[in-house]
C-alpha cells in the first residue's frame, strides 16, 4: 500500500465505531484476538465505509442502496495517492482537475480526490440512477460539493465524447473499468467466491454491483482498448489518461494498442494485502 495512505495500518475500530455507532454491531474479535468485521457482509462493509469516510475524510451521510458496488476505500485511496505521485512529476501550477469515468453511485474516487488533495473532479456515468445517487451523496457535504460535478453520459458507446466540453482541460482521467466480459462470467466469479468462503449460494454477500459496474462486452481489456482509441481525440484536453488494470494478462494487449498510437505510457504496480493490481497511465506528446 502507498506510504501516504492513512489506511496502510489496521483499522482503529474503537475510533470508527465512535464515529459511526451502527458499525459496532458488526465488529467482533477473530481467533487471533484482533477486532474485525465480516467483509462478506454487505451491510457490515457499508457501515465500515460510512465510518471511514466520516472519521478520516469528514464526509457525512454517505450511503448507497443495496446491490450497488460498495468499494474498498483503502484500495481506492491508493489509486489517488499513486496518481498524485504521477502528477508531481509534471510540475503542475494551480488547481488540479480530474475526470472519473464510471463514477458509480458511490462516487468514491472524486470524494477521496477532493478530501485528500483538494482536487476538482468531474464524475461521469452511463446509469442515470447512479448519477442521481452520486449527486445526492455529494450535495449533502458542502466541503466536497464545491469540488465535484457529476454528468450523465447518455451515449453508451462513448467514454469521453459528450463529457469533456470544448475549452475544458483535465490533468488526468481515472477509471475502474468493468471487470468481466459477460453476466455469465460475473456469475461464475461470484459462485467461486461463495465456494471459497464455504457459504451457501444465496447468502447475503458483498459481491454486489449493477451490471454496468461489473461487466461489459469484451470485459476489462476491450473497455480499455476503447478508451485508448477515444483518448486520441482528447489528447490536448487531458494530461494523463489512466485506468486500473485488474488482470495482469491484459497488459500485453493494452501495450500493443498504446504502441500503435505512439503513446507515452507507464505501468504503476499497486498491492493491498494479497491483492495485486496496477494502473496503466498514458499521454500523447
Curated annotation (Swiss-Prot):
Recorded name of the encoding gene: rlmF
Source organism of the structure: Christiangramia forsetii (strain DSM 17595 / CGMCC 1.15422 / KT0803)
Name this protein carries in UniProt: Ribosomal RNA large subunit methyltransferase F
One GO cellular component term: cytoplasm
Keywords: Cytoplasm, Methyltransferase, rRNA processing, S-adenosyl-L-methionine, Transferase
InterPro entries assigned to the protein according to its UniProt record, in alphabetical order: METTL16/RlmF, rRNA_lsu_MeTfrase_F, SAM-dependent_MTases_sf
EC number: 2.1.1.181
Family: Belongs to the methyltransferase superfamily. METTL16/RlmF family.
Substrates-to-products reaction catalysed: adenosine(1618) in 23S rRNA + S-adenosyl-L-methionine = N(6)-methyladenosine(1618) in 23S rRNA + S-adenosyl-L-homocysteine + H(+)
GO molecular function, one term: 23S rRNA (adenine(1618)-N(6))-methyltransferase activity
SS bond partners: none
GO biological process, one term: rRNA base methylation
Major enzyme class: transferase
Function: Specifically methylates the adenine in position 1618 of 23S rRNA.
Subcellular location: Cytoplasm
UniProt KW Cytoplasm keyword: yes
PANTHER family per UniProt: RNA N6-ADENOSINE-METHYLTRANSFERASE METTL16, SAM-DEPENDENT METHYLTRANSFERASE
Amino acid at each position: 500500500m502507498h506510504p501516504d495512505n492513512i489506511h496502510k495500518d489496521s483499522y482503529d475500530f474503537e475510533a470508527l465505531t465512535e464515529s459511526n455507532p451502527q458499525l459496532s454491531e458488526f465488529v467482533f474479535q477473530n481467533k487471533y484476538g484482533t477486532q474485525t468485521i465480516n467483509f462478506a457482509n454487505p451491510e457490515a462493509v457499508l457501515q465500515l465505509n460510512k465510518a471511514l469516510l466520516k472519521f478520516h475524510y469528514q464526509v457525512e451521510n454517505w450511503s448507497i442502496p443495496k446491490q450497488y458496488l460498495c468499494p474498498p476505500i483503502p484500495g481506492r485511496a491508493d489509486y489517488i495517492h499513486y496518481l498524485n505521485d504521477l502528477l508531481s512529476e509534471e510540475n503542475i501550477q494551480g488547481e488540479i482537475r480530474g475526470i472519473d469515468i464510471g463514477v458509480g453511485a458511490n462516487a468514491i474516487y472524486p470524494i477521496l480526490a477532493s478530501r485528500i488533495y483538494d482536487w476538482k473532479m468531474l464524475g461521469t456515468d452511463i446509469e442515470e440512477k447512479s448519477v442521481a445517487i452520486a449527486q445526492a451523496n455529494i450535495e449533502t457535504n458542502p466541503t466536497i460539493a464545491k469540488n465535484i460535478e457529476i454528468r450523465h453520459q447518455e451515449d453508451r458507446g462513448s467514454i469521453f465524447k459528450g463529457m469533456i466540453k470544448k475549452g475544458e482541460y483535465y490533468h488526468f482521467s481515472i477509471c475502474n473499468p468493468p471487470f468481466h466480459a459477460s453476466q455469465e462470467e460475473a456469475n461464475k466469479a461470484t459462485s467461486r467466491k461463495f465456494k471459497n468462503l464455504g457459504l451457501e449460494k444465496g447468502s447475503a454477500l458483498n459481491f454486489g454491483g449493477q451490471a454496468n459496474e461489473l461487466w461489459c462486452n469484451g470485459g476489462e481489456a476491450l473497455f480499455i482498448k476503447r478508451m485508448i482509441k477515444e483518448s486520441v481525440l482528447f489528447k490536448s484536453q487531458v494530461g494523463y489518461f489512466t485506468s486500473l488494470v485488474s488482470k495482469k494478462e491484459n497488459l500485453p494487449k493494452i501495450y500493443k494498442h498504446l504502441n500503435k498510437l505512439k503513446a507515452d505510457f507507464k505501468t504503476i504496480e499497486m498491492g493491498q494485502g494479497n491483492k495485486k493490481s496496477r494502473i496503466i497511465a498514458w499521454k500523447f506528446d
